[in-house]
């Protein structure tokens, strides 16, 4: 099969995987509505998802707070896919309209992240650098869930993890904490022995097809 043929088949498979039943107005978490393959969801997040940790100082309490977010944006025409993904994740999180004809799916409640989001990616691991972001994100989530971030030691652990997550620490955080006190931990390494599932390939529309041919 030619490269163009492979691309066409994967695009057809991708559409077949998520263009099933659609929840257009309400979220129905009935098991029979789960139409997405879990590897497809992982592949989709590898291509378009993000794991974020925000550390912000509260003006009222005068202390630092930590919030987490699992999210991704799509064009509004793909809103039905976001709704299916929300159903797949047991209805947690929310879908909001953004600017430039974008819609965004977010999960920010720590209990939902711990009990719904993290278990999925433990069972169906990410294959790109998103895997490293996920491991760091998970470690921060566990600190927050156990309220360890409320202590100075726990907050320093969060900052050390965040320093290696995505773009690292903001200028404000670097100026607010002594440089010697925050040491970025080494980013977890992505396994080079992972077996690529065809459903992952169909889901990872943002990941280039060259992984098939190198």
Give the positions of each predicted feature.
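Sequence-level preference for short, compositionally simple segments enriched
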Residues: 1-214
């Amino acid at each position: 099969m030619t490269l163009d043929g492979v691309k066409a088949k994967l695009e057809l498979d991708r559409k077949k995987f998520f263009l099933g039943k659609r929840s257009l107005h309400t979220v129905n978490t009935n098991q029979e509505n789960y139409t997405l393959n879990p590897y497809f969801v992982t592949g989709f997040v590898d291509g378009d998802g993000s794991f974020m940790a925000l550390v912000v100082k509260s003006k009222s309490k005068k202390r630092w707070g930590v919030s987490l977010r699992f999210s991704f944006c799509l064009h509004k025409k793909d809103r039905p896919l976001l709704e299916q993904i929300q159903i797949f994740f047991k209805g947690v999180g929310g879908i909001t309209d953004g600017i430039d004809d974008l819609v965004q799916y977010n999960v920010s409640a720590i209990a939902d992240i711990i009990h719904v989001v993290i278990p999925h990616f433990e069972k169906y691991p990410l294959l790109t650098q998103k895997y490293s972001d996920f491991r760091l994100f998970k470690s921060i989530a566990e600190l927050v869930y156990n309220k360890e971030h409320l202590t100075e030691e726990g907050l320093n652990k969060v900052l050390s993890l965040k320093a290696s997550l995505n773009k690292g620490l903001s200028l404000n955080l670097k100026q607010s904490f002594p440089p010697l006190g925050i040491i970025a931990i080494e980013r977890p390494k992505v396994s080079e022995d992972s077996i690529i599932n065809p459903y992952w390939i169909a889901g990872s529309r943002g990941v280039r097809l060259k992984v098939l041919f190198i």
